[in-house]
Amino acid sequence: MEGPLSVFGDRSTGETIRSQNVMAAASIANIVKSSLGPVGLDKMLVDDIGDVTITNDGATILKLLEVEHPAAKVLCELADLQDKEVGDGTTSVVIIAAELLKNADELVKQKIHPTSVISGYRLACKEAVRYINENLIVNTDELGRDCLINAAKTSMSSKIIGINGDFFANMVVDAVLAIKYTDIRGQPRYPVNSVNILKAHGRSQMESMLISGYALNCVVGSQGMPKRIVNAKIACLDFSLQKTKMKLGVQVVITDPEKLDQIRQRESDITKERIQKILATGANVILTTGGIDDMCLKYFVEAGAMAVRRVLKRDLKRIAKASGATILSTLANLEGEETFEAAMLGQAEEVVQERICDDELILIKNTKARTSASIILRGANDFMCDEMERSLHDALCVVKRVLESKSVVPGGGAVEAALSIYLENYATSMGSREQLAIAEFARSLLVIPNTLAVNAAQDSTDLVAKLRAFHNEAQVNPERKNLKWIGLDLSNGKPRDNKQAGVFEPTIVKVKSLKFATEAAITILRIDDLIKLHPESKDDKHGSYEDAVHSGALND
């Protein structure tokens, strides 16, 4: 744009940029829209090197897309945030945000200032969260374990493992309850990362299993080592136990050929001393991220200890946390002397190498500091196993959230329909400009039941109208307030009581997705100017060789 102030780039302002942003958001939402709900479809994504991913998870789909538009990137980050914070509801949060933007754009085109729309949206979001917490939550104490299983099944219903929902829901609930520990404040905590998920392709989904203890996809370093150790003392090392070699560039001038042997002997003695220091503390299970050469293995075999090499760093960290061990990247202390103390060892009741499914695994059972659990997944191929892992991660997060927040809300579009009716009535009580924005917010929420119905090949107009009628009755007539649990039954194509049907989602999933979607919509709505700078041109007068040829500079 030329003018009094020259900007070396493209500048678009006002109406143009807002419409562009809304279109970008809508196109991102359209990608994930068809994967929402229990009958949502999967996406196949192929990256630039030909790796194939088949998934139904909104966050994974958007993470693998290479998005150019800055406003669309906001929505991709939004799905990622929802995945990290809550673990589920990633698709719906993007769809709601895009719908909020679309409706806000309509209002701005009718000459309503974006600031009024933004304040209306903020107010609507606040009211919606308050209404959920006061009227729509079901306390988990009155439902017990069934509630956890139902919440896990609801999360899995749209995924590849939805067919065997009962089997996997029980497995997930058992896994989360197995890793429970109490923090300093006396609050129960469920670190989902303590559940190690291993994948082995072959057999059917139903042959997946839950194992008590941490399963390591490794075997002992030598066949001469014991395969089972009771009262294990575990050393976690982040370095290799190999014959020490002199650093490159170190030169030793020798006057006597016999001294060569002494140097070689010293090289092997350094490692031997290290191993003896470790074994002297009573360590009988040694896990290392590096390699262990044959010479070092000999010492462990003689001592009757179990040594495991090439353990993944991620696994080592989790085992150290569970057993109370300290991960050491060197034995040297601040003075430069090599020491190893018994306090650095972790403890477990038993470490055993077992053949599970078709693989040899090392199981670390009953660790001292925290308990851990492992799930071994079976599936037809790698794509299936990867998708099963993502589905289980979502379900684990959902069960964790239900246990921590102790409340759930009905699924199947029930919350969105109830909020839509409530906010429409609330909007009419407002005398200010925010009234229109709140009404649009209410209309935007209906995109979830609408999309659910469309994906299930049902008549969305008819179904959503019936659903709204039930919720209106529930809010107007106090005697029929039980109708507020009505959501969609997508397999039969009619509304039903989702509290009785056991379709539940954690309250925090709904609350966070509303808050995040509103914030993302507001962030994009506030933008009224986009300046995209041109890439910096090189200082070189002629640029590249081709430019020089074209310009005739080489003809001089």
Curated annotation (Swiss-Prot):
Q: Which InterPro entries match?
A: Chap_CCT_alpha, Chaperone_TCP-1, Chaperonin_TCP-1_CS, Cpn60/GroEL/TCP-1, GroEL-like_apical_dom_sf, GROEL-like_equatorial_sf, TCP-1-like_intermed_sf, TCP-1_chaperonin
Source domain of life is: Eukaryota
Q: Which GO terms describe its cellular component?
A: acrosomal vesicle; cell body; centrosome; chaperonin-containing T-complex; cytosol; extracellular exosome; Golgi apparatus; heterochromatin
State the Pfam families in the record.
Answer: Cpn60_TCP1 (PF00118)
Quaternary structure, per UniProt, is: Component of the chaperonin-containing T-complex (TRiC), a hexadecamer composed of two identical back-to-back stacked rings enclosing a protein folding chamber. Each ring is made up of eight different subunits: TCP1/CCT1, CCT2, CCT3, CCT4, CCT5, CCT6A/CCT6, CCT7, CCT8. Interacts with PACRG. Interacts with GBA1. Interacts with DLEC1.
What disease involvement is noted? Intellectual developmental disorder with polymicrogyria and seizures: An autosomal dominant neurologic disorder characterized by a broad phenotypic spectrum. Main clinical features are developmental delay of varying severity, intellectual disability, seizures, and polymicrogyria. Additional variable features are non-specific pyramidal or cerebellar signs, and visual impairment.
Full protein name: T-complex protein 1 subunit alpha
Species of origin = Homo sapiens
Q: Which gene encodes it?
A: TCP1
